[in-house]
Every structure is written in C-alpha cells, then in structure tokens.
C-alpha cells in the first residue's frame, strides 16, 4: 500500500515539476525496471509511467526523446514477450492470474500509458517531420500482432491489445501507415473467427486517422465490408441484438465515422442499404450506448446531405442522401415513433428527435 502511495506521489511530482525532474530520468528508468518488485497496484504503476513519459515529452532533442521512449517500452515488452513464449505451439496457455506478472494485460496497459501520454513538442509534430515514436511503434508491431494471434479467444487480452494499438496509432497518426495493411488484414481475419467488437472500435480509429488520405479509403471500405458478414451473423440470431450491444455500438460508430470522414465514397457503396436495414432493426434496442450510436449513424447519414454546403462534394452528397431518404425516410420515422412510444426509455427521445428533425428538413411534405 505504501509503495503505491509513494508511486502516486512521484507521479504528481513528475507532472508538476517536469523541468526539474528531467535530470533524474535515468533514476526514474531504474525504478520502472524494478516496478514489478514493488507490489504496486496496476493504476499506480501506470501512473508512474505516465509521469516519466511527461518528462520525456519535454525533451527537445528528438533522438534523445526517441531513445527514451524506446527504453521505457522495452521494459514492458521484455516480460510481455516472455509471457507469450510460455504459450505452447498448440495454443495452450498457462493460467493467467489477473494483475500479476503472468498477466499480459499488465504490460499492455503500461504500453498504452506510454503512447497515450507521450506528447513530443506539446503534441504538435509536423506531418513532414518523422515522429520520434515512429520507429519504436513499428518495432513493437510484431509483438502486438503476436498477442492478437495468441490470445484471440481471450476477449480481455484482445481488448487491451487493441487499446494499445489504438493509442499507438493516435500517437503518430498517418505516420503509422506502414502498419495499416498488415493490421487491417489481421483484424479482418480475427474478427471473422472471433467477432470481438473491439476490432470494430479500432476500425473506427483507423478511419478517423486515415480517411483523409484518398489512397487509404478503398482499403478502409473493404475492411468495413469484410466486417459486415460476421456482424450480421451474430446480430441476426434470435436475441442477437440484446446479447451483443457492444457490437451494435461499435459497428454503427464505425459506419458513422465513414460518414464524417469520407461521406461520398461511403454513400456510394453497395452495402450501405443493408447497413440501413440493420440500423432500423437495431433502433429498438434498449441499451443507452448502442442506441445512441444507431441514432448518431442515422443523424450523420441524413446530415451529410446538408452539411458543408460550400464544399465541392456537396451536390453529390445531397443527391445520394436524398435518394436514400426517399426510399427509407418514411419507414425510419415510423419505426422511431413506434419504438419511442412502445419500447424505448425517455433518455433516447432527444436523439430520436434529432433524427426526425433531419428527416423533416429533407422532405417535410412527404412525412406529414
């Protein structure tokens, strides 16, 4: 207990006095190397890493910064690799004791803390300047890829691995492009066999980061298309929507992200109508987060036809959305009104109202 309190105090000191603590970096690194011997709570250990990373962030020499980040990551990668080496070729795993040195999540969360809090130059690295963390993240990818493969049946480890990848991608943005193809290929294959919704969530992060690059959009749309069949398979069985609200939430978040970042290519896909049909069925789901994602999808879909009127693609977007509204508008409003009256709780009414208002703005006469 005392060790955890001391670690928390040290974290606060690192955060408040970064400039003064920079000269003690090597000493802090030695503490990180011994952290598993201190019997710290996971939160305290992660906080300690956060404090050290804050100090690294103010280093002005990019080479020194990159070297410091790599050293912190190696301290976590070494035990993580040792744990994975204990998994047999047949996939048999030694028992994982949560929050112990046998738990890969312990080290994945620490890596997440590194990439979540590292901010070279205050977080503003120019696009044409190599990110100091790029080499470390590219070197780390084989380890994370292996973790996804080895622990594919363990949703807890898979979620934490995806979380680490998410923060790594957010850290260096489009400079992680070398990882995009192998990452998407592995995500698609593993989602087809295991259908963990965290892959859908990670997919939405990739869309957010890469959809601004025109050359990446076809591959991202192919990723979404590959996700559709496994998603429909688990949602279409009796009780599937109720049993898998996280999948509903993450699937429609992913689709909404395309509407926000690459609306025209998304609106032109052949599979969009099937997504709309799935959304209509999902709109009656009484689950706060899942229902909110479905409504956000409907809202973003309709709003895409009116948003950014000065943009060059506005006329194309408007035409595509009008065609969809003409086919689905009445059915959508009817479904939402019935669901609000008979099934859904009052906390959904605001989102439902926003969707219906967008429908009215498109064609008030038809919907009277």
For the regions a protein language model found, what residue spans apply to each?
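Karyopherin-beta/Importin-beta family HEAT-repeat alpha-solenoid scaffold
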Residues: 1-368
């Amino acid at each position: 207990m005392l060790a955890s309190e001391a670690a928390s105090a040290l974290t606060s000191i690192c955060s408040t006095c970064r400039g003064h603590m920079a000269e003690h970096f090597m000493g802090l690194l030695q503490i990180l190397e011994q952290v598993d011997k201190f019997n710290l709570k996971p939160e305290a250990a992660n906080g300690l890493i956060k404090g050290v990373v804050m100090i690294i962030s103010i280093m002005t020499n990019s080479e020194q910064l990159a070297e410091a980040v790599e050293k912190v990551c190696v301290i976590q990668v070494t035990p993580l690799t040792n744990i994975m080496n204990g998994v047999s070729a047949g996939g048999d795993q030694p028992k994982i004791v949560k929050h112990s040195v046998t738990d890969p999540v312990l080290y994945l969360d620490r890596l997440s803390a590194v990439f979540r809090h590292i901010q070279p130059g205050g977080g503003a690295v120019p696009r044409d300047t190599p990110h100091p963390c790029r080499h470390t993240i590219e070197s780390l990818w084989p380890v994370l890829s292996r973790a996804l493969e080895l622990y594919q049946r363990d949703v807890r480890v898979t979620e934490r691995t995806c979380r680490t990848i998410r923060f790594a991608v957010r850290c260096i943005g489009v400079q992680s492009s070398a990882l995009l193809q192998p990452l998407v290929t592995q995500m698609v294959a593993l989602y087809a066999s295991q259908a963990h919704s965290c892959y859908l969530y990670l997919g939405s992060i990739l869309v957010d980061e890469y959809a601004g690059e025109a050359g990446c959009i076809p591959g991202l749309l192919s990723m979404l298309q590959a996700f559709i069949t496994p998603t429909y398979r688990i949602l279409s069985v009796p009780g599937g929507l109720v049993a898998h609200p996280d999948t509903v939430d993450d699937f429609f978040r992913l689709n909404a992200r395309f509407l926000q970042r690459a609306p025209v290519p998304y609106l032109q896909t052949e599979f969009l109508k099937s997504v709309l049909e799935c959304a209509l069925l999902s709109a009656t789901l009484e689950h706060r987060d899942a229902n909110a994602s479905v409504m956000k999808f409907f809202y973003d879909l309709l709003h895409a036809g009116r948003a950014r009127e000065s943009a060059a693609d506005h006329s194309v977007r408007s035409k595509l959305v009008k065609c969809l509204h003409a086919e689905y508008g009445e059915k959508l409003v009817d479904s939402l009104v019935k669901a609000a009256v008979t099934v859904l709780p009052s906390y959904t009414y605001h989102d439902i109202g926003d969707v219906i208002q967008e429908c009215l703005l498109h064609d008030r006469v038809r919907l009277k």
